[in-house]
Structures are given as C-alpha cells and as structure tokens.
C-alpha cells in the first residue's frame, strides 16, 4: 500500500466526507529510546521521574502519577507533551506495541528502558492519536510485526513504516473528544464499582463476628443477643447428586469472576455430557481450589458443577442468602484456606465441616442477607453498565478507524 492512499472509515460524524490519508509514522515524526546505561542502584531515588512500563501498557493515555524516581544523566531523553510511548516486548503477540500518549508538560520526566518513544512533527489531536493507535485495525498491524517464540518483540524501524489513518485535524478533534468523554464515563463507573466493592468488604468485616467472638462489630437496630456457635453442616447440606446431562449448562471453576460470585461469561450454550454435581437455583457453589477469592457462586439457574466444587443447599434452620454471605466472611475463608496438597491445594472437607461458625437468630439472618443482597444487586447493576460501556467503546474503535 502506498503512502497517502485514501480510505474511508465505516462510521463518521456528520459533515465529514473527505477521504482519510494513510501515512507512515516515520514520515510524521521521529523515535527516541528510553533510559539507557542504568543500573538498579539508579532507581528508587533521585530528582527525576520515569514513566513505567505498566503505565504505557495499561492505558491509551499515560497516567502522570504512575512514575517512579530515578537518577539520570545528560544523555537521557526527556519526554514532552504529545509524545507516544510503545512497549517493545511481551509474552504474546497480542500485547506487543501497546501505545500510550503523554499529555503532561512537567520537566525531568523520562521513559523506561523497555519502551521506545515517538515524537510527532505534524499536528495531531493527542486524543485521536491515543485511541487510533489502540484501534483494532492498528493493533492487528502491530501483531503482524511481532517476532519471537517464547517472547515477542517489535522493531521500531518496522513500526515507523506502518501506515496509519490521518484525517483532517478538525475531524481528529471530534473523534478524540468523543473517545475521551467515553473513557471518562467508563473511568467514573469503574471508580463507583470499586467503591461499592470496598463498601461490601467493609460490611463483611463488621457484620460478622471475628476471631471466635459471638458479637459482630456492627449490628442492625433491635438485635443484641450473642450469636450461637454452629458447625457448617448444621446450616448447610452438602449436595452430591451427580449428573451427565447434556441439556443443563455446565459451570467450571474458571467461569467464576474473582471475588464477585458471578459468571464472567454466558454459559447457556456451554452444553456437553461431562459428569459433575447437579445444582439447583439458589444452591451455593464453592470451589475448593486456590485462589479462594474466586470460588463461590449463588446461581439463579439449574446446572451441573464440573470439577472441584462443593455444592451447598441451605437447611430449614437458616436463610439461604445469609449462608451465601457467611461463606464470604473472614472466618470462613480462614478455614477454607487451611488446605492440603502442594501442586493443587484444596480445602479439607473434614476441617471445614467440623469448624464452628457464629450464627445469629433467623430474623437477624434475614436482615443481613437482605442488606447484602441489595448491595450485591447495586454492584451487579454498575457492573453491567460498565460492561455495556466497554462493549460500546470496543464497537466504536472497530468502526471509526480505517
């Protein structure tokens, strides 16, 4: 493909009809290296800062706070506003050449040695540049440049030969502003979600007794009695109904989102004839394998649990939703983490089942269960909103660049 060949994106803002130029990066700017000649003694102190590899890797726009101290000399290249950073190496070709644009004017800032920099010499809207370089059409080009077997690398000279779409600056500004606003909205939802999850963890700490105590730190009004000590087998039954149904959905350990008690994908079509433990709606699925922050699910459907799961059902002396949150409490997790085995450590049923847990009256169980259920519903709502926004962004990145 020749430089300057015209193209049209699939989706555009109104009033823009001109074709987009395809231009080589190397004809619009120059590259520079990151820190060189440094030893580990140079890092962690000094008056200069450097942009970390993870800062570049994790976002199309660099975070000015993700920098660390370093001692520098006059040979090093300071970064400037509008510079682009590229990662040069990764374990997979999909993650090579991840880009990030620096939008700060602070001095004495440098780039880490595992990335290279690019300084544009033509006018670019920085946000257009940031999201264009992360668009699927450009990411595919980077993957094709990746070379290696156990670790993949790219040549900055090859990157400079890459053709990228360059519309008029006014259209760039429109696109850049659009994606910046969308990213800001996503960030806002991520922060809200993180705060809700922190809130839940705080309440799990305070609404359940700790370290053998019979009284929680925080209680609902009207409850003052000591909690009774009950073994787990007194509040849940362990289900052992095996099934190899090829009609019911199958749940595996990796399907559960870490620490959230929900599935990370739709498993309705994941049907096969493998044998597992049959579970019903509102049973509790508890994975025995580490990590234990990713091992519980309270399904609202019937299915088959494959592999290392315990399936619990609440007994008639307790409230199902209370059991669900009891299993997330600190005391239960300590017992579950008392594992046996080395290669694949597992919780020990004899240990878990015989351990005493503090249990309140049924009325207090209802209050606690309802409270956490409402909090979980709010978390799920924000999670879904966030996922929809992320899918929306993914779709626009696919259609708005060529």
Regions from the language model: what does each represent?
Residues 173-185, 189-192, 228-230, 284, ...:
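Extracellular/lumenal glycan-associated surfaces
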Residues 23, 106, 110, 214:
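Short, charge-patterned binding micro-sites
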Residues 5, 36-39, 109-114, 146-171, ...:
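A short glycine-rich beta-alpha junction/loop motif
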Residues 1-17, 191-225, 384-402:
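Short amphipathic coiled-coil heptad-repeat segments
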Residues 1-2, 10-15, 37, 70, ...:
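Short, recurring structural edge motifs at helix starts
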Residues 52-53, 64, 69-134, 264, ...:
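A short beta-sheet element
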Residues 12-35, 219-242:
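Non-catalytic DNA-recognition/assembly elements of restriction-modification systems
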Residues 26-39, 54-84, 235-240, 248-281:
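Sequence-specific dsDNA recognition surfaces
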């Amino acid at each position: 493909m020749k430089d300057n060949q015209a193209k049209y994106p699939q989706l555009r803002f109104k009033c823009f009809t001109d074709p987009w130029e395809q231009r080589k990066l190397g004809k619009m700017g120059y590259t520079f290296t990151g820190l060189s000649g440094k030893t580990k003694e140079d890092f962690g102190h000094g008056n200069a800062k450097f942009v970390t590899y993870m800062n570049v890797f994790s976002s199309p726009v660099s975070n000015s706070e993700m920098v660390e101290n370093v001692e520098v000399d006059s040979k090093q290249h300071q970064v400037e506003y509008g510079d682009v950073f590229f990662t040069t190496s990764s374990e997979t070709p999909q993650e090579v050449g991840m880009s990030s644009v620096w939008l700060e004017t602070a001095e004495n800032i440098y780039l880490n040695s595992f990335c290279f920099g690019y300084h544009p010499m033509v006018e670019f809207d920085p946000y257009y540049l940031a999201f264009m370089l992360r668009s699927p059409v450009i990411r595919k080009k980077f993957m094709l440049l990746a070379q290696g077997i156990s670790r993949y690398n790219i040549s900055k000279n090859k990157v400079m030969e890459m053709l990228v779409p360059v519309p008029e600056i006014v259209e760039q500004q429109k696109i850049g502003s659009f994606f910046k606003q969308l990213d800001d909205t996503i960030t806002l939802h991520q922060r809200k979600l993180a705060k809700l999850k922190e809130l839940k963890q705080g309440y799990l700490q305070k609404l359940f007794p700790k370290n053998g105590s019979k009284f929680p730190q925080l209680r609902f009004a009207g409850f003052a009695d000591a909690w009774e000590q009950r073994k787990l087998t007194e509040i849940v039954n362990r289900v052992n109904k095996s099934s190899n149904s090829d009609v019911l959905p199958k749940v595996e350990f990796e399907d559960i989102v870490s620490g959230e008690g929900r599935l990370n994908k739709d498993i309705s079509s994941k049907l096969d004839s493998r044998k597992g433990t049959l579970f019903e709606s509102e049973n509790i699925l508890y994975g025995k394998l580490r990590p234990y922050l990713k091992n519980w699910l309270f399904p609202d459907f019937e299915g088959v649990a494959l592999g290392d799961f315990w399936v619990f059902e609440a007994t008639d002396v307790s409230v199902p939703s209370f059991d669900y949150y009891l299993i997330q409490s600190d005391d239960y997790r300590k017992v579950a983490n008392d594992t046996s085995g080395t290669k694949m450590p597992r919780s020990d049923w004899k240990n878990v089942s015989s351990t005493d847990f503090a249990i309140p009256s049924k009325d207090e169980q209802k209050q606690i269960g309802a409270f956490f259920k409402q909090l979980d519903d709010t978390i799920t709502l924000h999670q879904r909103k966030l996922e929809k926004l992320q899918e929306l962004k993914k779709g626009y990145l696919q259609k708005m660049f060529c």
